[in-house]
């Protein structure tokens, strides 16, 4: 029997959160070109909160427009480090560079969620958390990346605070 809820994301973490809360859902990634949207919004001087909200809404609405009568959940998170938006790393070297940038510094994790039905948003929420990463040597950061392997490539903050990264 198909679910009435669709997660517009390929994020394993987001799916796990829903499952841990006994929320059954189907997964249908939106395939929104996040980099293009982000670049356009940055050119318009949009805040990190607006960027996160718009991406969550765009993802949910896109999947919702092709799945009428279903409730679609879209989400997005961005990292703001002193006005610089940190993007997902494309490879391990880039993940290490991001960790070095965040090392010992305060930064903000901005997360948004949007619920859409029939291609239109019916609810959204955005929140901001202040985080501070401890100081680590480059060797410690390398060791951490080895431990979490390719999982570092699936999160904006690289260190995935919901898992092993909470130790950072």
Q: What are the functions of these language-model segments?
A:
Residues 1-71, 84-85, 139, 143-147:
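N-terminal polybasic phosphate/anion-binding patch
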Residues 1-23, 95, 105, 128-168:
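GST superfamily/GST-like fold recognition
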Residues 29, 81, 115-117:
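Residue-level signal for short segments within beta-strands and strand-turn junctions
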Residues 97-100, 111-131:
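Anionic-ligand binding region
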Residues 74:
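Generic enzyme active-site microenvironment
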Residues 77-107, 133:
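Active-site-adjacent loop/tail segments of enzyme domains
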Residues 37-41, 80, 120-127:
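Acidic/polar active-site rim loop that often engages polyanionic ligands
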């Amino acid at each position: 029997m198909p679910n009435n809820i669709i997660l517009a994301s390929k994020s394993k973490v987001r799916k796990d959160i829903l499952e841990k809360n006994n929320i059954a859902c189907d997964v249908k990634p939106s395939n929104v070109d996040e980099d293009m949207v982000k670049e356009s919004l940055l050119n318009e001087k949009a805040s990190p909160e607006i960027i996160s909200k718009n991406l969550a809404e765009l993802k949910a609405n896109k999947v919702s427009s092709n799945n009428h009568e279903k409730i679609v959940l879209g989400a997005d998170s961005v990292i703001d480090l002193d006005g610089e938006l940190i993007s997902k790393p494309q490879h391990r070297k880039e993940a290490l560079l991001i960790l070095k940038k965040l090392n010992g510094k305060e930064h903000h994790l901005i997360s948004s969620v949007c619920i859409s039905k029939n291609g239109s948003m019916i609810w959204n929420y955005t929140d901001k958390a202040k985080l501070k990463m401890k100081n680590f040597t480059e060797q410690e950061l390398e060791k951490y990346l080895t431990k979490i392997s390719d999982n570092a490539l699936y999160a904006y903050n690289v260190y995935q605070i919901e898992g092993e990264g909470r130790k950072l």
